[in-house]
């Protein structure tokens, strides 16, 4: 979920598997409990069985934290969200828990009339009241400043204190939002609702203010080509987009991302778009669609000594490109895309996870069978990747089913391409880099998921730095 990534970036905390749940997971848990006999043969109902499962998920974290944030997706009135709203209603009645319910609404602006319309917000709150929930704070998304009369009207008709109606206006940068919310009093309204005294919990916005200053004082402009197949929906690469921005801020650079659809561009138009780019990045993905365009982009970066960054599938395709065009291995490819005896990338059948061996074959279900989550990698000293991380052992998040075939490693190293990062057991290549190239790195993991605005990922900082100096 996109919002989960925003929470990670703004709180500087990495989410756990238990930090997100879907309706499907809730219903699956209920059905499993019924099969086990936990309900003693009683008829399964949305209330109490489904709502109790939702409450159990929420309560599981409350014991260990001072404040927990829970976001319910969707729109008030959606059938899918009703059990979640009911669970929230029940939890709100628990006298041992202080809570604050924030309702996000949209305030449309009619340019022809020159006024903001609060009626949709009033009806939205009415829908919530029908579900037995009274919001404590209303966040008002708007493209225009919200006048005092509109705020007073929302307060009056929605049973919310005037100081708890918070404008949430568009900002030039998402990293201005904490300062804007504080300006309109969100922090004080929230603390009061949760039973805290605002004067005892002063908000430290200095890091965010300093970040805004760095953004405004950027000296360089750098053009980065991101060659993928999901570029029509840029939010598909949201974490990647933000990580590049973070790397740019750290280098005092404004990153101009050129989104290139690898499936729709022919080789001639692709080369035209890549020309003039300071760096080329191939992101992760699945499936054969669009891979030829990505491979051609990697070849262009390699032959023209342009900084190249391959992530997950991007690293695997770099291995394929080098195998085909440098090592001259006939029919070199990935078993994900082509049946060949020269699979330089193949399906993993087993790997170590927390001291346990996980196994899978080609007939296994795809769901839940990936090498998924945080895994360690050991970096070779005197490598570029080691100089970037400044650590021998790193931990990064993974999401893949295919891995570089170890049988070909020596052939790559003989041509100046070596695997400078491996899994702790030495079986799975994690990092590819080139001795001949100024900056040519492929990683099997997803570093973008750990980049933060106040703590940018070192790989993206190094990549943008190399692109500036190109």
Where are these regions (language model features)?
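Flexible phosphate-sensing "switch/lid" loops adjacent to ATP/NTP-binding sites
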Residues: 1-253, 263-279, 286-287, 293-300, ...
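Short, hydrophobic alpha-helical segments
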Residues: 158, 190-198, 326-330, 463-470
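C-terminal and late-domain segments of enzyme folds
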Residues: 365, 372-470
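Cysteine-nucleophile active-site neighborhood
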Residues: 273-375, 382-384, 453, 459-468
């Amino acid at each position: 979920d996109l919002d989960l990534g925003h929470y990670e970036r703004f709180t500087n905390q990495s989410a756990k598997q238990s930090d997100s749940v879907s309706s499907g997971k809730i219903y699956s848990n209920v059905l499993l409990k019924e099969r086990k006999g936990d309900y003693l043969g009683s008829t399964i109902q949305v209330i109490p069985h489904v709502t109790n499962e939702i409450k159990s998920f929420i309560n599981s974290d409350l014991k260990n934290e001072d404040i927990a944030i829970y976001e319910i997706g969707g729109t008030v009135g959606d059938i899918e969200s009703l059990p979640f709203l009911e669970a929230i209603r029940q939890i709100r009645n628990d006298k041992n828990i202080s809570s604050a319910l924030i309702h996000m609404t949209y305030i449309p602006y009619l340019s022809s009339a020159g006024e903001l319309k609060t009626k949709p917000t009033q009806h939205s709150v009415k829908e919530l009241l029908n579900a037995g929930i009274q919001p404590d704070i209303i966040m008002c998304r708007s493209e225009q400043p919200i006048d005092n009369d509109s705020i007073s009207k929302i307060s009056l008709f929605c049973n919310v204190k005037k100081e708890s109606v918070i404008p949430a206006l568009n900002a030039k940068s998402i990293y201005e939002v904490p300062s804007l919310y504080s300006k309109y009093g969100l922090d004080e309204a929230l603390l009061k609702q949760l039973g805290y005294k605002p004067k005892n919990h002063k908000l430290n916005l200095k890091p965010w203010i300093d970040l805004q200053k760095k953004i405004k004082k950027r000296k360089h402009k750098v053009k980065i080509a991101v060659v993928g197949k999901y570029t029509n929906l840029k939010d598909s690469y949201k974490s990647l987009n933000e990580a590049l921005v973070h790397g740019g801020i750290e280098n005092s650079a404004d990153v101009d991302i050129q989104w290139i659809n690898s499936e729709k561009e022919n080789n001639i138009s692709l080369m035209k778009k890549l020309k003039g780019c300071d760096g080329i990045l191939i992101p992760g993905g699945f499936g054969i669609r669009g891979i030829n365009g990505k491979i051609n982009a990697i070849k262009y970066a390699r032959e023209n000594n342009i900084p190249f960054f391959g992530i997950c599938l991007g690293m695997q395709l770099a291995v394929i490109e080098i195998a085909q065009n440098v090592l001259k291995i006939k029919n070199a490819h990935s078993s994900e895309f082509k049946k060949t005896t020269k699979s330089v990338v193949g399906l993993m059948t087993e790997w170590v996870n927390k001291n346990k061996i996980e196994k899978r074959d080609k007939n296994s279900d795809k769901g839940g069978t990936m090498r998924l989550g945080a895994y360690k990698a050991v970096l070779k000293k005197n490598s570029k990747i080691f100089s970037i991380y400044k650590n021998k052992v790193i931990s990064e998040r993974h999401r893949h089913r295919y891995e570089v075939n170890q049988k070909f490693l020596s052939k790559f190293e003989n041509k100046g391409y070596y695997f400078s990062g491996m899994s702790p057991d030495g079986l799975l290549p994690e990092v590819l880099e080139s001795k001949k190239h100024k900056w040519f790195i492929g990683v099997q993991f997803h570093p973008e998921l750990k980049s933060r605005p106040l703590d940018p990922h070192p790989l993206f900082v190094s990549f943008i730095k190399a692109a500036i100096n190109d």
